[in-house]
């Protein structure tokens, strides 16, 4: 027995302003039913002794220390600029 109907799929598609053919609605109904069935299987798992976690893998800081380094010379930075003025990038105005 399907847990979701074609009418429900069409209703949600209509709410999302998505155009959907009858064939697509039937396909999505089957796919959503499979997803709901899988989610119900997950609900049956015993997680009593499983500690809460926000990530599947252990998380640790893998970033290097933030150490200042000398920057590039201004001329080298500006050589790729499409437009420059007074040693700075010049960009088109976006506000009037």
Curated annotation (Swiss-Prot):
Its EC number is 6.3.5.-. Keywords: ATP-binding, Ligase, Nucleotide-binding, Protein biosynthesis. GO terms for molecular function: asparaginyl-tRNA synthase (glutamine-hydrolyzing) activity; ATP binding; glutaminyl-tRNA synthase (glutamine-hydrolyzing) activity. It catalyses: L-glutamyl-tRNA(Gln) + L-glutamine + ATP + H2O = L-glutaminyl-tRNA(Gln) + L-glutamate + ADP + phosphate + H(+); L-aspartyl-tRNA(Asn) + L-glutamine + ATP + H2O = L-asparaginyl-tRNA(Asn) + L-glutamate + ADP + phosphate + 2 H(+). It holds the Pfam family GatC. Residues 64-96 are annotated as: Disordered. The keyword ATP-binding applies. InterPro entries: Asp/Glu-ADT_sf_sub_c, GatC. SUPFAM superfamilies: Glu-tRNAGln amidotransferase C subunit. GO terms for biological process: glutaminyl-tRNAGln biosynthesis via transamidation; regulation of translational fidelity; translation. Signal peptide: none annotated. Allows the formation of correctly charged Asn-tRNA(Asn) or Gln-tRNA(Gln) through the transamidation of misacylated Asp-tRNA(Asn) or Glu-tRNA(Gln) in organisms which lack either or both of asparaginyl-tRNA or glutaminyl-tRNA synthetases. The reaction takes place in the presence of glutamine and ATP through an activated phospho-Asp-tRNA(Asn) or phospho-Glu-tRNA(Gln). Heterotrimer of A, B and C subunits. This is Aspartyl/glutamyl-tRNA(Asn/Gln) amidotransferase subunit C. It comes from Geobacillus thermodenitrificans (strain NG80-2).
